[in-house]
Amino acid sequence: MKIASQNADRALLLVIDVQRDISPGGRLAIAEGDAVVPAINQLAGSFQHVVLTQDWHPANHTSFASQHPGKQPFDQIELGYGPQTLWPDHCVQNSPGAEFHPGLSPELLARTELILRKGFRPGIDSYSAFLENDKQTTTGLADYLRERGFQRIFIAGLAYDYCVRYSAVDAARAGFETWVIQDACRSVGPASSEDAATRAIEQIGVNRITTADLL
């Protein structure tokens, strides 16, 4: 029996930030970021329930290097809530770059029960689908999932070393059985960043699997 088919009504596919700006040709392009799209589309038939997250930044978002004179994308700074990586302007609200990747299948979108927009507060970033970067402000997703009886979360999307990593860690901390679908993710940073993400999710007990384990 495939993993996702066990208690299928309590299993959820969580797709992180598969958007135009985070795909090749976008403002925060991830190399081979669009390679996750076919894998995620394949998974649609294995899940009854899907949630998509969407980076949704105001134009003056504090995570943008353009808001900090003298700083460049990928510089590190300290903000009131802790360290922050600065990014190119990306996924600005209502811009074409904030749209979902056009290759996501109609079947996947038809099964989507919630689109969770994150990073919309100007003064704080939100890598995780569950908590803002201050680790205190909740997105409400954990309560939404608990109220509907979900227990098992399978995560795919972009970027593995940031938003997937922090979403997986926070899902596990919130008490959900959590899997990351490795071949349906890509990283934005170097190999060292990907390795750090893998260590972080494994240390908290998140499982790493592939699409073959689910199809």
Regions found by a protein language model. Give the residues of each.
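Extreme N-terminal starter segment of soluble prokaryotic enzymes
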Residues: N7-L13
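Short, flexible loop segments at boundaries between secondary-structure elements
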Residues: V180-E194
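Residues at the starts of beta-strands that form the adenosine-phosphate
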Residues: R10, Q48-H49, T112, R152, ...
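Active-site flanking residues adjacent to catalytic metal/cofactor-binding acidic residues
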Residues: I16, Q54, Q182
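Histidine-anchored nucleotide/phosphate-binding helix
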Residues: A39-L43, V164-G175
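Short glycine-enriched, charge-decorated loop/helix-capping segments at active-site entrances
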Residues: G26-G33, A129-N133
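Short acidic-hydrophobic, aromatic-tinged amphipathic segments that line or gate anion-handling sites
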Residues: G205-L215
